[in-house]
Curated annotation (Swiss-Prot):
SMART domains: AAA (SM00382)
Biological role stated in the UniProt entry: Part of the ABC transporter complex ZnuABC involved in zinc import. Responsible for energy coupling to the transport system.
Protein name: Zinc import ATP-binding protein ZnuC
A Gene Ontology molecular function term of the record: ABC-type zinc transporter activity
Enzyme Commission code: 7.2.2.20
Reaction equation(s) it catalyzes: Zn(2+)(out) + ATP(in) + H2O(in) = Zn(2+)(in) + ADP(in) + phosphate(in) + H(+)(in)
Ranges for domain ABC transporter: 22-238
Quaternary structure and interacting proteins, as annotated: The complex is composed of two ATP-binding proteins (ZnuC), two transmembrane proteins (ZnuB) and a solute-binding protein (ZnuA).
Name of the coding gene: znuC
A biological process term (GO) from this entry: response to zinc ion
Sorted UniProt keywords: ATP-binding, Cell inner membrane, Cell membrane, Ion transport, Membrane, Nucleotide-binding, Translocase, Transport, Zinc, Zinc transport
UniProt record similarity statement: Belongs to the ABC transporter superfamily. Zinc importer (TC 3.A.1.15.5) family.
Binding locations of ATP: 54-61
Amino acid sequence: MFGLIHNPPHAGRLPAAATTLVEARGLTVRRGDQPVLCNVDLVVESGQVVTLVGPNGSGKSTLVQVLTGVIRDYRGQVGRRTGLRVGYVPQHFRIDRNLPITVRRFMKLAPRGRRGHWAEAVADAGVSQLLDRPMQGLSGGELRRVLLARALLSRPHLLALDEPAAGLDQRGQGELYRLIRHVRDRYGCGVLVVSHDLNLVMAATDQVLCLSEGHILCRGAPESVRAHPEYRALFGAHLGPETAVFPHAHGPGEGCTHG
């Protein structure tokens, strides 16, 4: 079943394939007189990895918040599968150093209904050896894995990750993206990744959407987006011969088109 999150009176029900998790059509968000998202179309399906790239302020995080139901004030149509379970890993997570807490205690603070998969989530995220460590003493990569484990407690259909590789070195990025691929394959979930840099896009990405000032400039496989004139005009000053996209295995897919 595919349930409508929000539907203006004049709009019809969104059709959806059995594998569709979330879908947006003509999505527009404004803050006062300022547009944040403009006429965005997007579909995320089970087992698919979709990455949103763009500079700061391009609307990436707002789009994720609308798709996951956090923001409900918008125009256009957004639908999601009935009973959709969402796991979210934020970019920033503040830990109060005056309130020491172990990883084990942090994991068990989850809502009671989500504790049934506690051991499984801990194992899948690779944090079993961290359970007795204080949260305040974790490295950036360790903290990301703990937050991922917590997001897995609900066995999500959709996993949303906001800048998961930010602040990690190259080795840490590779380890994190391998872990995300493992989770995607094991759970069969869709994955929505936010990034400001196409060069950090994970190898398993099926589709990249490049946003700027709330508009989709282009979309497609990582290589096609990186070669697109709109993308190069936006990031060209930062592109050089040393930059490269992670190796990408992709079957026949759509090329880069204007949103």
